[in-house]
Structure formats: structure tokens, C-alpha cells
Regions:
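Long, intrinsically disordered low-complexity tandem-repeat segments
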Residues: 363-415
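C-terminus-biased signal that marks the final domain/tail of proteins
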Residues: 3-28, 33-362
């Protein structure tokens, strides 16, 4: 990946986590051709949102760090170079914003305090250390901790913050007019409407390498979705995973759990935490079953051929589990929908799944019956043509009078010329 960034570059910044059975690497792509990747310490945990967190990193530690050769030079040349309190090159401050965006701050703070309630962090901290040690050194995080992190909506903060997707939502005894008063309480939660397909990857060093660990699939919004385990060596997936419709499809796994979340989030006064509690009970059972499956297949770790031979079995088990759970989801969805209808609530997943700017076509106006054709008025007979008046004969041409002979010209009398002078 680093080679691709060096050769091709990156149009934007991103964070990538790469892991296998031996180690986990955290990589910040700093845009352009710059990047820094570090090996995650085995005794640390990290909570990170959509921003940069790496502070000072020893770029010469080639065993634990992979970085672009000009990462520090480019920051200096661009004028964005920043240092920590000890004068060392600070990656996040040099390549990221001066302050955390509010949505990044709220999620980072919520995640740290959820996983480590005794942590000394505050909401106003200038920066959050990326790799952290739990206050309790004996703390071991579980799958359920990871699920809870993805779903969290500030429940553990005792009302200090409210998810900002609740702005304008009527609360008991409140018509929404208190939104302005509670402005500072509304924050961007970890479990928000934009967090979809937030899976959990469990790397198990005791499984055959070809299994690739376990993917705890969380289709749909993380707020109210169940996590279901699948190995990475499946040869096929259940039919409900295959529809690719852009709006609600009752045969789709994604759209079914999306609808369940949609009903739960828009009717919290009805469902409260019951949906999450239902999934948590289901997940406890799935974790027990998955541990038994892991114990069965770990015997094949050092036998690649035997591990490959059970791929059909693993696939069949996954298809059977998917079918069973999907039928349960459909039943649960139907019960929630029926309950809302009984309460007189509206619930139309087809309409709700359409984009906000979608407008239903206006119904066609009913065709008006044509007015009966009025009979044409009878044609009035034309008036009889008046006979033309007889042409009066032209008067006879009178003969011209005979030309009289000219009188003989009398000779002119000569008169003397008189001249008058005008005054």
C-alpha cells in the first residue's frame, strides 16, 4: 500500500488498519505521496474518528514504523510544520486541522470514556493520545465491548450529551422548543445514521490461516443492528445478502435491519432500548456457538489441506445460520411494524428509504368525460343572388365638330417701345 501511495499518490487523507495473526498496523495516509504507518502495541487500545492522531513518531524505527521519506520535509516546505511541546515533529498537527472537528472530538471522547470509565481525559483536551493503556491494567476488552462501541449514543454519560439526530424530535412534555436551550448538549454520536456496515474483525491466531479470522457482520446502521459471525473462507453467501436495490427490499438483509433501526430510532418512546437488548441477548448465544466452532477447527491450524477440505462444511453452516437468523429478523420486523400501526403511527419503509430530495409523482388528474358534441346549426340557405341590373347602353359618340379654318394672320403693328423705371 505504501508503494502505491509513493508511485500513484492519494487524492485525500485516510486511515487504514491492516492486521493478520501476527500483528496489527495503523496507517495514516496524509494525502499526496505522504504517509506514516506504525505497529500497534499489543498492550494498547485506540479510539479514532475521521481525523489524524499520530503525534511524534521515531521515523528511524524501521521495525515499528513505515513512513514516506519526505513526510517531514514536505511539511516544512509547505509551511504547515508543527512540533510537540518538546520540539519534535508532530504529524497530526502538521498535516491535519489545528483543532479537532466537533464530530471527531465527540466520538473520540465517548469511545475512550466508554472503554475506560476511569480515564482522566476531558471533552476539552487539545489532543487525544492515540494508543492508550486502560486505567485498570488487568482490563481485557471483549467482542461485546466492540459491539457497544459501534452502537454508543452517549448512554454512559448520564445525560450530558444527546445524539444530534434527535434535534427537532419531540420528547415527552416538549414540542421541540427546547432545542435551542439544549444546543450544547447535541453531539455527533458513535452510533449515528451514517455508520453502516460497521463490522467487527476478530483475528484468532489459533485458527487455520485460510479461515482469515471471524467477521462479525453488522449490516445496516450500527445503532440497532445485530452482529453475526462468519469465517473468511466461505464459498457462497445467503440470498438475502445479494439484492443490490437502492430502496427498501423485503428480501434484503440490509434493508430489513435498516427498517428495524428506522422504526426504533423514530419511535424511541415506544421501543426505547428494547431492540438493542434483543440483539445483545442473541449475540451472547452466537458468541458461545462461535467459540465452540473455533475449538473444533483450531485442530486444523497446521494442516492446510484439511482446512481447505472443510470449506464446503463451513459454507453450509453459514448458509443455514443466515437463513435461520433472517427469518427471525423478518418476524421481529413484522412485529415492530404491527405494533406501530396499532398505535396509529406511520411506518412506510418503501417511502422512508427514498432519498430526501425524492418527490412522489403527482397523481394523474382524472380524465374529464368529453362534453357531448353539440349538433351543428343547420346551414342557412344562401340568399338568392339578385339579378344584375341591365347594362345601360353607352351614349352614342357625338361626331366631332368640323375644324374651322384658321383666320389669316394680320401683320403686327409696330409700336414704339416705352420704358418705365421702377421706383
Amino acid at each position: 500500500l505504501a508503494k502505491v501511495i509513493e508511485e500513484k499518490g492519494s487524492a485525500e487523507g485516510n486511515t487504514v488498519v491492516i492486521a493478520d495473526q501476527k500483528e496489527t498496523w495503523y496507517m495514516e495516509i496524509l494525502s499526496g505521496h505522504q504517509y506514516v504507518a506504525v505497529k500497534v502495541p499489543e498492550d494498547k487500545y485506540a479510539v479514532f474518528a475521521n481525523t489524524y492522531y499520530l503525534g511524534h513518531v521515531n521515523l528511524n524505527d524501521t521495525e515499528n514504523v513505515i513512513a514516506s521519506k519526505d513526510v517531514e520535509k514536505v511539511a516544512k516546505e509547505s509551511g504547515s510544520y508543527k512540533t510537540d511541546k518538546d520540539g519534535n515533529f508532530h504529524i497530526a498537527k502538521s498535516y491535519g486541522p489545528e483543532k479537532y472537528a466537533e464530530g471527531d472530538r465527540s466520538r473520540t471522547y465517548a469511545g475512550i470514556t466508554l472503554l475506560d470509565p476511569k480515564s482522566k481525559v476531558t471533552y476539552e483536551d487539545d489532543e487525544y493520545e492515540l494508543f492508550r493503556s486502560p486505567t485498570d491494567p488487568n482490563k481485557k476488552f471483549t467482542l461485546e465491548d466492540a459491539f457497544a462501541l459501534q452502537r454508543n449514543r452517549f448512554e454512559h454519560l448520564n445525560g450530558r450529551f444527546v445524539p444530534d439526530d434527535q434535534i427537532g424530535v419531540k420528547k415527552q412534555g416538549d414540542n421541540g422548543s427546547n432545542d435551542a436551550v439544549r444546543k450544547d448538549q447535541y453531539k455527533y454520536a458513535l452510533g449515528n445514521e451514517n455508520v453502516i456496515d460497521a463490522h467487527v474483525y476478530q483475528i484468532n491466531p489459533n485458527l487455520p490461516k485460510s479461515f482469515g479470522g471471524t467477521l462479525w457482520l453488522g449490516m445496516g446502521p450500527s445503532r440497532n443492528t445485530p452482529y453475526v459471525p462468519f469465517y473468511g473462507n466461505l464459498k457462497d453467501t445467503y440470498e438475502a445478502f445479494k439484492p443490490q436495490t437502492a430502496t427498501y427490499d423485503p428480501n434484503s438483509w440490509y434493508w430489513t435491519v435498516w427498517h428495524i433501526d428506522n422504526m426504533a430510532i423514530n419511535n424511541q418512546d415506544v421501543f426505547g432500548k428494547s431492540v438493542q437488548d434483543h440483539w445483545k441477548a442473541l449475540e451472547k448465544q452466537l458468541i458461545i456457538e462461535q467459540e465452540a466452532s473455533d475449538a473444533k477447527y483450531k485442530a486444523l491450524k497446521d494442516n492446510p489441506e484439511a482446512a481447505k477440505a472443510v470449506e464446503d462444511e463451513v459454507t453450509a453452516n453459514a448458509l443455514a445460520l443466515s437463513k435461520k437468523l433472517f427469518e427471525h429478523f423478518k418476524s421481529y420486523e413484522a412485529d415492530m411494524h404491527a405494533h406501530l400501526i396499532e398505535l396509529g403511527r406511520k411506518d412506510d419503509p418503501y417511502r422512508a428509504s427514498k432519498p430526501d430530495d425524492y418527490k412522489d409523482p403527482e397523481p394523474e388528474k382524472p380524465v374529464q368525460p368529453e362534453k357531448p358534441v353539440q349538433p351543428e346549426k343547420p346551414v342557412q340557405p344562401e340568399k338568392p343572388v339578385e339579378p344584375e341590373k341591365p347594362v345601360q347602353p353607352e351614349k352614342p359618340v357625338q361626331p366631332e365638330k368640323p375644324v374651322q379654318p384658321e383666320k389669316p394672320v394680320q401683320p403686327e403693328k409696330t409700336q414704339p417701345i416705352q420704358t418705365k423705371v421702377n421706383e
